């Protein structure tokens, strides 16, 4: 369905229930080859064995784990995460991160492995 998503209006409960770390995610597009969601909050370090991911940072600055490095990110950055790559473990400087996440193929419910 053609649509315009006003990402600036997507806050709090509009993104769904928060998990135990305060992370929220709402999928807006689910197609044959990908899903598109808006994510808000901090996530523990994890990986997806079968899903590639791209995150476009909308709000928040700080660091995230990408592979074996902790890297700084800011609004406007695009993070490319090939399947099997450890990522997350966000450390914001102030406001939690808000990002658009594109996953291909669409992520299965059991395709997240938490890491130390």
Question: What label would you give each PLM region?
Answer:
Residues 38-39, 47-66, 102:
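Short, conserved beta-strand element in jelly-roll/cupin
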Residues 31-32, 65-69:
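Short strand-coil-strand connectors
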Residues 83-109:
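Ligand-binding loop in jelly-roll beta-barrel domains
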Residues 69-84:
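Short acidic-glycine-tyrosine-enriched beta hairpin
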Residues 1-38, 45, 114-116:
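A short, N-terminal "cap"/entry segment at the start of jelly-roll beta-barrel domains
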Residues 61-63, 70, 86, 96:
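Structural motif
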Residues 33, 51, 96-97:
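A structure-centric signal for secondary-structure junctions around beta-strands
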Residues 27, 44-49, 90-92:
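Short histidine-centered beta-strand/loop micro-motifs
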């Amino acid at each position: 369905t053609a649509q315009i998503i006003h990402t600036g209006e997507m806050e709090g409960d509009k993104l769904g229930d928060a998990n135990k770390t305060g992370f929220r995610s709402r999928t807006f597009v689910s197609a044959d080859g990908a899903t598109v969601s808006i994510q808000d909050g901090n996530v523990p370090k994890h990986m997806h064995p079968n899903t590639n991911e791209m995150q476009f940072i909308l709000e928040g600055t700080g660091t995230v784990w990408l592979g074996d490095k902790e890297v700084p990110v800011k609004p406007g950055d695009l993070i490319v995460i090939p399947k099997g790559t450890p990522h997350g473990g966000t450390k914001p400087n102030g406001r939690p991160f808000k990002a658009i996440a594109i996953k291909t193929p669409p992520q299965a419910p059991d395709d997240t492995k938490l890491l130390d």
